[in-house]
């Protein structure tokens, strides 16, 4: 029984000890963006533009960890990006407008519906 308690305690301590390393690896900042596509733009039409923005710009930025996107009904769109830091997320936004893929991406979005929030772990 004492061996079991020792092993259990060791496992718990190891789990807590690696949590900060896992958080850094997975990104400490979660960026959530929502928007609506312009009238007449389908999810099938927009999806390749969304993938191009990720591939050609976002994924190449310092501090990028991961990105996923999904569409809802009526042109709703959701993008979740994980960054290592707020500084990395802000730096990416500062260069986004200049990215070649961004122009086509933004041309299909209704600007007044765009919302971005950042959360920290």
Model-derived regions: residue spans:
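Phosphate-binding glycine-rich loops and adjacent basic patches that engage nucleotide phosphates
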Residues: 12-17, 50-56
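Intrinsically disordered, low-complexity segments enriched in polar/charged residues with Gly/Pro
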Residues: 24, 43-44, 54-57, 67-68
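Short alpha-helical
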Residues: 41, 74, 87
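An amphipathic, aromatic/His-enriched active-site/gating alpha helix that lines ligand/cofactor pockets
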Residues: 51-65, 82-118
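Glycine-rich beta-strand-turn "strand-cap" elements at beta-sheet edges
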Residues: 7-8, 13-14, 18-30, 35-38, ...
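Positively charged n-region of N-terminal signal peptides that target proteins for export
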Residues: 1-5
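Short, surface-exposed ligand-recognition loops at beta-strand->loop->(often short) alpha-helix junctions
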Residues: 36-49
């Amino acid at each position: 029984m004492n061996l079991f308690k020792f092993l259990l305690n060791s496992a718990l301590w190891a789990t807590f000890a690696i949590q900060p390393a896992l958080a850094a690896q997975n990104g400490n900042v979660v960026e959530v963006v929502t928007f609506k596509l312009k009238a007449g733009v389908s999810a099938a039409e927009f999806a390749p533009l969304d993938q191009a923005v990720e591939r050609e710009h976002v994924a190449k930025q310092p501090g990028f960890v991961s990105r996923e996107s999904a569409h809802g009904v009526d042109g709703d769109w959701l993008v979740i990006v994980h960054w290592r830091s707020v500084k990395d997320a802000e730096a990416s936004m500062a260069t986004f407008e200049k990215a070649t893929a961004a122009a086509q991406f933004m041309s299909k979005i209704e600007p007044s519906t765009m919302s971005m929030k950042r959360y920290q772990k």
